[in-house]
Amino acid sequence: MATVPEKIHVLIPCAGSGSRAGTALPKQYTLLQGQPLVIHTVKAFAQVAGLSQCLLVVAPGDVTLSDFLTQYGLGHWSVASVGGATRAQSVLAGLRHLHSQGASDADWVMVHDAARCLIEPAHIANLISACRADAV
């Protein structure tokens, strides 16, 4: 049986520029059914019980996400403007930010890309259950 962490955090990198997608806006802000992709992603995680801190990592100067979070009633999510040039750099900066906000080395952090909006709350809950039931 895995050691159950005191806290499970969520880190969603959202600092992409959309250059590979060839879009005017970053891909995470592309609309799907009238809402930005990132909002679909955040809503899925928002429905999962037992998550501690939920952090979205954006590029420095990006205020678009905070506006969207407020607009869709998700203003309680934390946003850190520490995104890097690559996804890996953004994740590392996000992990450092979580640590500076009290996350411990023993806590778990779930990382999920902002533009991967087809995740469902049941998928997330099942992953947590599977990890808790197996030595990781």
Where are these regions (language model features)?
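Conserved donor nucleotide-binding strand/loop of the catalytic core
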Residues: 73-87
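Short active-site oxyanion
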Residues: 51-55, 78, 135
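Acidic helix N-cap motif at the loop->helix transition within catalytic regions
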Residues: 63-69
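Short helix-capping segments at alpha-helix termini
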Residues: 48-50, 71-77, 102-103
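Conserved beta-loop-beta/alpha segment of the NTase-like Rossmann-fold superfamily
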Residues: 85-136
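Short, glycine/charged-enriched secondary-structure capping and boundary segments
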Residues: 25-28, 69-72, 95-96, 123-127
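N-terminal glycine-rich phosphate-binding loop and ensuing alpha1 helix
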Residues: 4-63
